[in-house]
UniProtKB/Swiss-Prot annotation:
Coiled-coil regions listed in the entry: none
Entry EC number(s): 6.3.3.3
Subcellular location, record wording: Cytoplasm
Keyword Cell cycle appears in the UniProt entry: no
Organism (species): Clostridium botulinum (strain Langeland / NCTC 10281 / Type F)
Protein name: ATP-dependent dethiobiotin synthetase BioD
Length: 227
């Protein structure tokens, strides 16, 4: 049976895709068969008449995953807006049935599956015939989560608000990862200390422009759960 984790963040452009790629890369470098999936992607590039799922393409390149990155994403939109709005603009009905079908197809190819969210944790995926929020996807696949947060000013507030929402939705958070961390920045140091001291969740860091995570592989493996 495969094991999975969901990667979400405290907001947009926090570094979810970057961290997701480094996690998968770390596992694959130790011969762990880890794959990637994303339900909906906005802001895709168009090349030679074809939309390119940029996030998936980045992850595949960094983590050395073979195959077409577009196959790892159920819905790909060019407009850089929330998935529900992109679907409206393109007259597309987003279906949980398709998301489930694609997810299980990817899951069956790997021993570990890393699922990346869209934007922050409160993200409408569909407001059409089916009302789908990001947390619905996390819960239907029974995935635990990693929360990616920026290491800088304001992260205590945004991280705790994100965790409170996830607690209300009964989503298990296994790790907080502070991105763009600078070991000489007093704000970053204090944010890590405060969150570590006041939350019952492990807090790790990822240095800015790092090409690998310093988190032990054993710790990463522990947070993936059977799905």
């Amino acid at each position: 049976m495969a094991r999975g984790i969901f990667i979400t963040a405290t907001g947009t452009d926090i570094g979810k895709t970057y961290v997701t790629a480094l996690i998968i890369k770390r596992l694959r470098e130790t011969n762990i068969n880890c794959g990637y999936y994303k339900a909906a992607l906005s802001g895709a590039e168009r090349r030679d008449g074809k939309l390119i799922a940029g996030d998936a393409n980045y992850v595949y390149n960094i983590a050395n995953i073979k195959g077409d990155p577009n196959d790892a994403v159920s819905y790909i939109f060019q407009q850089a807006v929330s998935p529900h709005l992109a679907a409206k603009l393109n007259n597309v009905e987003i279906s949980m049935e398709r998301i489930k079908k694609d997810f299980y197809s990817i899951k069956n190819k790997y021993d570990y599956i890393t699922v990346e969210g869209s934007g922050g944790i409160v993200c409408p995926i569909s407001t059409g015939k089916e009302k789908i929020m990001l947390d619905n996807i996390i819960k239907i696949f029974k995935l635990p989560a990693i929360v990616v947060a920026d290491a800088g000013l304001g992260t205590i507030n945004s991280t705790i608000l994100t965790l409170q929402y996830m607690k209300e939705k009964n989503i298990s958070v296994k790790m907080i990862l502070l991105n763009n961390y600078n070991h000489e920045d007093i704000i970053h140091i204090e944010n890590k200390r405060y969150l570590s001291d006041n939350l019952l969740i492990p807090v790790y860091t990822c240095n800015k422009n790092a090409n690998k995570l310093e988190i032990p592989v054993e710790k990463l493996i522990e947070i993936y759960e059977e799905i």
